[in-house]
Design a protein with these regions (language model features):
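A conserved nucleotide-sugar
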Residues: 60-62, 215-224, 237, 241-284, ...
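Short His-centered aromatic/hydrophobic patch
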Residues: 117-123, 141
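A short, well-ordered alpha-helix in the C-terminal region of glycosyltransferases
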Residues: 223, 354, 361, 368-384, ...
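N-terminal strand-loop element at the rim of the active site
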Residues: 20, 28-31, 35-94, 262
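A conserved mid-protein helix/loop that constitutes part of the nucleotide-sugar donor-binding site
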Residues: 43-54, 223-246, 268, 353
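A conserved, positively charged/aromatic
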Residues: 137-168, 174, 181-182
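Short hydrophobic beta-strand element within catalytic cores of glycosyltransferases
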Residues: 65, 325-328, 338
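Conserved acidic donor-binding segment of nucleotide-sugar-dependent glycosyltransferases
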Residues: 340-341, 345-353, 361-367
C-alpha cells in the first residue's frame, strides 16, 4: 500500500508564531477575524474554533465567534474571544433572510476584516452578508462532500464560494477537486492539530488515571484495546469485534469508549455480535469520558477502524501524541497521519483479518519496540500535527489575504 511506504516523519521544524501586520487590516488595528459555526458543542470543529480564537488573539488580532451557542461558550470567552449567539445552524432557507441580517449587523458592529465559515448552513447565511460588506471570506471543509444529488451538490458547493478554502486533509482536498472545478488555485490543506500539551503522557497524573479506571471499572492485569468513538455504525465497532474474534488466543479486553451512549438498537447489536463471535466477557461498552488523555494512558492499543474513510480523525493524532500504538484502515485521513509500523499500523480497508493481525502485532510488541514506537509517535505529532502548527498555517493564510487586499486597495 502506497501510504505505508511513502510516509515520512520529516525533520523537526521550528515554528515561530506569526503576528499580524496591523497596516494590512482596516483602520490600522489588529484584524478582526469572525469564525462562524453552527454550535459550540463538544467536537473537533468546535475545539479547532477555540484553538484558532486563542491563536488570533496571540497574533495580535481580535477573535469573534458567531454560533448558536453551547456548552463550550464559557471556554471560548475565557480565552478572550467575543461570542455572538445567533441561530446560524438553521437549515430552513425561509428563515435565512432574518438570520443573515443579524449576522450582517454583527459584522458591521465588530468592524470585521475576515469571515471564516466552518459549516454549510452558516456559509449560506453568512457569506452573502460578508460579501455585501466587501469582507475577505475563508472556509474550512471538515467533512466528506456527498455530491450524488444535484441539490446536495449545490448545497455543499457554497463552502467553496470563498476567497480561500482550507481542506483538513489531502483526502478531503481530493474529494473537492474531483467534484468541483476552479477551486484548486485557492485551496490549501491544513491538517487538524492536537494539543500536545494536553495530550502528554508525562503530564497525566496517577490520581487522574485512578479516577478513570474506577469510573469505567477497568481491570489492571489485562491489555486494553480501546475504540474511542461516537456510537455510530460507520465507526467500525462490529468489524473490530470480527478482528478480535480471530485473535482470541491473546489476552485482551476491548473497551468501546462512548458506545454505551448509543441507542438501544445500536448497543444491543454490538453486544449480540460480540456474543455470537465468542467474545463474551472480552469487551465492554462504556460512556464517553471527559479526560481523554487519561483514557489514552490506560490503553495498550488504540483502534480507529472506521469503515467509511475519516476526513481526518483526531483520535489517531491524540493516541500518537500520548505514545500509544494506533491502528486504522489505510484510507481517508488516517493514511496521512499514521506512519505504518513506525507510529502505528494501517490495515487493508475493511479487512477484519488484516486488522486482527495488526492488533496482534501491537499486543505482542517487545518492551523495547514499544518504547521506540512511543518516542517516534510523539515526535511525529509534535513535528507535523500540533495545534500550534495548524494555527500558524491558518494565521499565515489570513495574513496573505489581508496583504493581498491591502495591495489591491492602494
Amino acid at each position: 500500500m502506497s501510504s505505508k511506504t511513502n510516509q515520512k516523519s520529516g525533520g523537526k521544524t521550528s515554528l515561530s508564531p506569526p503576528k499580524f501586520v496591523k497596516k494590512h487590516s482596516r483602520g490600522g488595528h489588529g484584524p478582526v477575524i469572525v469564525q462562524i459555526l453552527p454550535r459550540l458543542v463538544r467536537g473537533g470543529v468546535e475545539r479547532g474554533t477555540i484553538e484558532m480564537a486563542e491563536a488570533i488573539i496571540a497574533a495580535g488580532g481580535k477573535a469573534v465567534v458567531i454560533s448558536g451557542g453551547g456548552i463550550l461558550e464559557h471556554q471560548l470567552t475565557r480565552c478572550g474571544a467575543i461570542h455572538h449567539r445567533i441561530p446560524v445552524y438553521e437549515k430552513n432557507p425561509l428563515k435565512w433572510g432574518l438570520i443573515r441580517r443579524q449576522v450582517r449587523a454583527v459584522l458591521r458592529q465588530e468592524n470585521a476584516d475576515i469571515v471564516h465559515v466552518r459549516s454549510r448552513a452558516p456559509a449560506w447565511i453568512a457569506l452573502p452578508a460578508a460579501k455585501s460588506l466587501g469582507l475577505i471570506t475563508v472556509s474550512t471543509v471538515h467533512a466528506r462532500f456527498h455530491t450524488k444529488s444535484f441539490l446536495k451538490r449545490i448545497y455543499n458547493g457554497k463552502m467553496l464560494k470563498t476567497d480561500h478554502v482550507i481542506a483538513i486533509s489531502e483526502y478531503v482536498k481530493s474529494l473537492i477537486t474531483r467534484s468541483y472545478f476552479g477551486v484548486e488555485e485557492r485551496l490549501s490543506v491544513i491538517h487538524r492539530g492536537v494539543d500536545v500539551k494536553a495530550f502528554d503522557a508525562n503530564d497525566v497524573t496517577q490520581p487522574r488515571i485512578i479516577r478513570l479506571v474506577e469510573r469505567i471499572d477497568l481491570p489492571e492485569d489485562v491489555p486494553l484495546v480501546m475504540l474511542p468513538a461516537r456510537p455510530t455504525s460507520w465507526k467500525g465497532h462490529e468489524i473490530l469485534l470480527e478482528a478480535l474474534a480471530g485473535i482470541k488466543h491473546l489476552p485482551f479486553l476491548c473497551v468501546f469508549l462512548g458506545a454505551a451512549e448509543g441507542r438501544a438498537s445500536f448497543t444491543d447489536r454490538i453486544v449480540q455480535k460480540g456474543v455470537e463471535l465468542g467474545l463474551e466477557g472480552r469487551f465492554r461498552l462504556t460512556e464517553a469520558v471527559e479526560d481523554m488523555p487519561a483514557a489514552m494512558m490506560v490503553a495498550d492499543v488504540v483502534v480507529m477502524p472506521s469503515i467509511t474513510p475519516e476526513p481526518f480523525g483526531r483520535v489517531a493524532l491524540e493516541a500518537q501524541a500520548m505514545g500509544r500504538p494506533v491502528i486504522a484502515f489505510d484510507h481517508g485521513g488516517a493514511a496521512e497521519s499514521i506512519v505504518h509500523e513506525k507510529t502505528g499500523w494501517l490495515a487493508k480497508p475493511n479487512d477484519a483479518d488484516d486488522l486482527g493481525r495488526c492488533i496482534a502485532a501491537a499486543l505482542e510488541m517487545s518492551d523495547n519496540k514499544r518504547r521506540l514506537m512511543r518516542k517516534a509517535s510523539r515526535n511525529h505529532i509534535e513535528q507535523s500535527f500540533s495545534t500550534a502548527k495548524m494555527c500558524s498555517e491558518t494565521i499565515r493564510v489570513y495574513a496573505r489575504l489581508l496583504a493581498k487586499k491591502a495591495a489591491a486597495e492602494r
